[in-house]
Swiss-Prot record:
Pfam families: NDK. Keywords: ATP-binding, Cytoplasm, Kinase, Magnesium, Metal-binding, Nucleotide metabolism, Nucleotide-binding, Phosphoprotein, Transferase. NCBIfam families: PRK00668.1. Major role in the synthesis of nucleoside triphosphates other than ATP. The ATP gamma phosphate is transferred to the NDP beta phosphate via a ping-pong mechanism, using a phosphorylated active-site intermediate. This is Nucleoside diphosphate kinase. It comes from Shewanella sp. (strain W3-18-1). PROSITE patterns: NDPK, NDPK_LIKE. Belongs to the NDK family. The lineage of its organism: Bacteria, Pseudomonadati, Pseudomonadota, Gammaproteobacteria, Alteromonadales. ATP binds at K11, F59, R87, T93, R104, N114. Its cofactor is Mg(2+).
Length: 143
């Protein structure tokens, strides 16, 4: 098993409903360690930059508007096969299709406001982590 880092966002809908602590509990119960975290209110430019790969898709404007609608929590999680483990905890992108007990099944209302984001691969995790965190902000958990 490989120790990896992955990037995670708790989106404005879940922050507004005070689900941060419950979601962090899910991460930690699954064996993922939080090695960096901060609350941000994204600017339009930050959201457009982060989601640039979707800029030509029809939902881009709505996505940017949603992600700038309120504060978010961004965090870096570390653990064995962290990318896959985190995505399993999140559940399907569409909460209507997410397995019971997953974050999206329990905390999301719709595919558009689906509570959380998780990197889909080690490579995208590295890119997404670097977008929000400097190397100095990452705190390895050795105990």
């Amino acid at each position: 098993m490989a120790i990896e880092r992955t990037f995670s966002i708790i989106k404005p809908d879940a922050v507004a409903k005070n689900h941060i602590g419950a979601i962090y509990n899910r991460f930690e119960t699954a064996g993922l360690k939080i090695v960096a975290a901060k609350m941000l209110h994204l600017t339009k430019e930050q959201a457009e930059g982060f989601y640039a790969e979707h800029s030509e898709r029809g939902f881009f404007g709505a996505l940017v508007a949603f992600m700038t609608s309120g504060p978010i929590m961004v965090q870096v999680l570390e653990g064995e096969n962290a990318v896959l483990a985190h995505r399993e905890i999140l559940g399907a992108t569409n909460p209507a299709q997410a397995a019971p007990g997953t974050i999206r099944a329990d905390f999301a209302e719709s595919i558009d406001e689906n509570a959380a984001h998780g990197s889909d691969a080690v490579e995208s995790a590295a890119r997404e982590i670097a977008y929000f965190f400097s190397a100095e902000e990452l705190c390895p958990r050795t105990r």
